[in-house]
């Protein structure tokens, strides 16, 4: 036990070096010898190396440097520049209990089942082995080592901008409010001029089921391998469910991507209110967000940024085996969701949402959507997508999908397709992969909706409003948001569609197959088979059937108008 002051304590064997009375280095010696020490240091900037065994280390307020097991600390001009835990086998370590008081603490718990608790301050904690580097007292790097070693750590840090790399094992991490950076398994953090430059998980095949409870603030979480449980408080959080990498320039995010895409688990991620960014990664994940403008990738992918704003979101799995059946529940707000492959369920509350049911890409300029396009069009499965009130955009993708939208002017493509926007107005909507797709059920709410159902015997129902519907494949062109042309494409592909449009001035092209078309009151324009409509200043000027030899027996019932 030491009193008030800045004490240096080695619990077992060790060596401390000085030059001209200034400390230059400190290290454990005889690392396979020692005992279970109890070390208490009262207030001050203390340096403690527990050494061999399971030690109990307690400090009062101050900026403490603590190594739970064996290790070394190097100094320049009396300031620590490198702290490293260096046990290469669990036998020389122990289950340490570390309680650090308020302050900016540096803690390397080492191997075995450790418990680390800190009070308020900007703490840096490594749950297992690793290294911290500093320049002039400012953190430059934190990295895991001996990544295959480690065990079940419990880490709880107080309020502040904390940094935690939990390491190997099924760890539990809890942080108070603040802008925290947490890696659930092994990883590396690089800092330039005190700002985070790179965060990356390492050892993608290593790790376990972590429970990460991160408090209020703008947090960064890379959960790592395993079926992790991640919960974040209010704030704009960035979360990768499995392995990944995030890059920054001058503290501003530039790139976020999945790594080790064939490794991971079925994660459960909950982010409370804020503009959150979440990449679920490998497996069938459950992702839940509260109100805010969220960006969510259900599987593996990447997001690119310019000046801190997302300009490209892309899901990039090229095989179903690296994905899973995700369940995504997004709160009210203007959400961007790329569900990825497999049988996904997507539900959103009110807002102008953009949802891709399978793989694809979204592009933005100054925060405004410029394009949405499907990719890996032959892949995908049965998605269920339900979006709330608002002007929503949905490209459901491959498979027998069910799409339901609330009231608003929605744009829905039942299978694969591409949407292009100019000055925030729709310029072109086109289905793609005409021979691909399945029987979709599209229930579109009240509003002036645009629907291209795609391949298959689709069931389309639209609410009150002036809707534009193509039963099979097609393309619609606009100038400054005003329609100029509508035509069937892939005219030898499609199915026997059932299209019901409630009251309004609806435009419907049934396309290939034997279609059933029903409208309510309104001035409707209907082509039972393939065809083209041309417009001038938004007014229909010509209607022409095409590929008449490919038609079939349609049933058309129209209401008053």
Regions inferred by a protein language model and the residue ranges of each:
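Acidic, glycine-rich low-complexity segments
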Residues: 1-561
């Amino acid at each position: 036990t030491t009193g008030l002051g800045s004490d240096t304590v080695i619990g077992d064997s060790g060596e401390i070096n000085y030059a001209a009375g200034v400390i230059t280095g400190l290290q454990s010696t005889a690392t396979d010898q020692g005992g279970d020490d109890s070390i208490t240091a009262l207030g001050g900037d203390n340096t403690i190396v527990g050494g061999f065994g399971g030690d109990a280390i307690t400090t009062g307020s101050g900026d403490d440097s603590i190594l739970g097991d064996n290790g070394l600390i190097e100094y320049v001009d009396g300031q620590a520049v490198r702290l490293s835990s260096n046990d290469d086998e669990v036998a020389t370590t122990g289950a340490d209990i570390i309680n650090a008081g308020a302050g900016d603490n540096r803690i390397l718990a080492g191997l075995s089942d450790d418990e680390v608790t800190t009070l308020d301050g900007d703490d840096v904690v490594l749950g297992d082995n690793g290294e911290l580097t500093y320049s002039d007292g400012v953190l430059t790097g934190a990295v895991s080592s001996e990544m295959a070693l480690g065990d079940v750590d419990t880490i709880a840090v107080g309020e502040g901008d904390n940094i935690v790399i939990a390491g190997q094992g099924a760890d539990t991490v809890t942080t108070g409010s603040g802008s925290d950076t947490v890696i659930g398994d092994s990883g590396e953090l690089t800092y330039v001029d005190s700002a985070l430059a790179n965060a990356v998980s390492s050892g993608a095949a290593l790790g376990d089921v972590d429970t990460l409870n991160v408090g209020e603030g703008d947090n960064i979480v890379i959960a790592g391998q395993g079926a992790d449980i991640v919960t974040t408080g209010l704030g704009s959080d960035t979360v990768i469910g499995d392995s990944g990498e995030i890059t920054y320039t001058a503290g501003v995010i530039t790139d976020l991507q999945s790594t080790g895409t064939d490794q991971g688990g079925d994660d459960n991620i909950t982010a409370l209110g804020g503009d959150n960014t979440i990449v679920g990664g490998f497996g069938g994940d459950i992702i839940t967000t509260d109100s805010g403008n969220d960006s969510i990738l259900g599987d593996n992918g990447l997001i690119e940024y310019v000046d801190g704003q997302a300009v490209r979101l892309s899901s990039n799995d090229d095989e179903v085996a690296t994905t899973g059946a995700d369940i995504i529940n997004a709160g009210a707000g203007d959400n961007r969701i790329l569900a990825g492959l497999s049988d996904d369920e997507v539900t959103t509350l009110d807002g102008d949402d953009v949802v891709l049911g399978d793989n694809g890409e979204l592009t933005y300029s100054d925060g405004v959507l410029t394009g949405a396009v499907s990719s890996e069009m032959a892949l995908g499965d049965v998605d269920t997508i339900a979006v709330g009130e608002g002007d929503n955009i949905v490209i459901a993708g491959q498979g027998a999908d069910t799409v339901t939208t609330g009231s608003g002017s929605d744009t829905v493509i039942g299978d694969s397709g591409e949407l292009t926007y100019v000055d925030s107005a729709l310029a072109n909507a086109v289905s793609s992969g005409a021979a691909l797709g399945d029987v979709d059920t599209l229930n579109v709410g009240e509003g002036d909706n645009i629907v291209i159902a795609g391949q298959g015997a689709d069931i389309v129902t639209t609410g009150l409003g002036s809707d534009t519907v193509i039963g099979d494949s097609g393309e619609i062109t606009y100038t400054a948001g005003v329609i100029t042309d509508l035509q069937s494409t892939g005219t030898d592909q499609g199915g026997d569609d059932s299209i019901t449009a409630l009251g309004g001035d609806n435009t419907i092209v049934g396309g290939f197959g034997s279609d059933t078309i029903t409208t309510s009151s309104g001035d409707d324009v209907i082509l039972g088979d393939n065809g083209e409509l041309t417009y001038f200043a938004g007014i229909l000027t010509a209607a022409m059937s095409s590929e008449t030899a490919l038609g079939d027996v349609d049933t058309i019932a129209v209401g008053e108008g």
